[in-house]
Curated annotation (Swiss-Prot):
UniProtKB keywords: Membrane, Methyltransferase, Mitochondrion, Mitochondrion inner membrane, Oxidoreductase, Transferase, Transit peptide
Name of the encoding gene: ndufaf5
Protein name: Arginine-hydroxylase NDUFAF5, mitochondrial
Entry superkingdom: Eukaryota
Biological process, per Gene Ontology: methylation; mitochondrial respiratory chain complex I assembly
Function: Arginine hydroxylase that mediates hydroxylation of 'Arg-111' of NDUFS7 and is involved in the assembly of mitochondrial NADH:ubiquinone oxidoreductase complex (complex I, MT-ND1) at early stages. May also have methyltransferase activity.
Principal place of residence: mitochondrion
EC number: 1.-.-.-, 2.1.1.-
GO molecular function, one term: monooxygenase activity
Pfam families found in the cross-reference section: Methyltransf_11 (PF08241)
Length: 321
């Protein structure tokens, strides 16, 4: 298996936009909990951690970039704790880990940071206002039904001048698998059902963070491309990650001939010269701060001492000197 990471300068297309997810019930959260429990209980569960390890380390890098010590932090939807293993107790002194999967919490990775586990849904955080200096999240928020509400809760539990640093998959994720399955079903069954869960578009994320109350926003995109022997191996690894579709309108079973046709289409349309096939994961990274009086603020309109009209005088001033 070959994993490569590269930055995206632009987004060519977006599959689904969910800026209005508030009040929607897209995902079966009980099913997602069972999927995560099953995946984390596998004897070889670490075999499927490669994507979470990569993204967790990149979230940790952004924590170090802030260059401050956080007395108390929260990891929302921590899974097996793939962020904390890349952090030190000199940066994060104490950590709360939350997840809907008790098995994930029991089988979490070790860290030198003193940690406390709380089984909790990302959509219902059981913490008081102004509790945490830092909130983290990596590859769990794309399964939340009410993403605007979850971001508001994160904002609420942060202390003033606290920071939220997160990562979630974006709308271009697994486009190869999505297209291959749709084309195969159209050909074999005369129509198609959704097999890949809907993801948030990068164009919506900044607006969602702003609406939740965050300021000094940063949103950037990475693309992680993993090469597999074939489409069936892509689907096997998604299951091992606990990342199978849990949308209420998912199709439970694929016909065998449709699956074989999709695998052939996948290899024909996207296959590499060595016979492998790529699977693309678009990762959206976000940083948002809870407002505080000490933070820098934009100058008031009209308060500048220099006008753009003065630029024409620069040459004259230089010649006078």
């Amino acid at each position: 298996m070959n994993v490569s990471v590269k930055s995206l300068r632009g987004v060519s297309r977006t599959w689904r936009s969910f800026s209005s997810r508030q009040g929607m019930n897209v995902f079966d959260r009980s099913m997602k909990r069972r999927q995560k429990d099953w995946a984390s209980s596998l004897l070889d569960s670490s075999k499927y951690d490669y994507l979470r390890e990569e993204v967790g380390s990149r979230v940790a890098d952004r924590v170090y970039d802030v260059a401050r010590t956080f007395p108390l932090a929260l990891d929302v939807g921590c899974g097996r704790s793939h962020i904390a293993e890349h952090l030190s107790k000199e940066v994060v002194e104490r950590l709360f880990l939350t997840d809907i999967s008790s098995s994930s919490l029991r089988n979490r990775k070790t860290s030198d940071i003193p940690a406390q586990c709380v089984m909790a849904d990302e959509e219902f955080l059981p913490f008081k206002e102004n509790t945490f200096d830092l909130v983290l999240s990596s590859l769990s928020m794309h399964w939340i039904n009410d993403l605007p509400g979850a971001l508001r809760q994160i904002h609420q539990v942060l202390k003033p001048d606290g920071v939220f640093i997160g990562a979630m998959v974006g709308g271009e994720t697994l486009y190869e698998l999505r297209c291959s399955l749709q084309l195969a079903e159209l050909e074999r069954e005369g129509g198609f059902a959704p097999h890949i869960s809907p993801y948030t578009a990068v164009t919506d994320l900044g607006n969602l963070l702003g609406q939740a109350g965050f300021n000094m926003l940063t949103v950037d995109i990475d693309e992680v491309q993993v090469n597999y022997p074939g489409m069936l191996e892509v689907m096997r690894d998604l299951q091992g990650m606990g990342e199978s579709n849990c949308a209420w309108n998912r199709k439970l079973l694929l016909q065998r001939d449709t699956m074989l046709a999709a695998a052939a289409i996948y290899k024909e349309m996207y296959g590499n010269e060595d016979g492998s096939v790529p699977a693309t994961f678009q990762i959206l990274y976000m940083i948002g701060w809870k407002p505080h009086d000490s933070q820098a603020k934009p100058a008031k309109r009209g308060s500048a001492n220099v006008s753009f009209a003065d630029l024409s005088k620069i040459g004259k001033l230089q010649s006078d000197q």
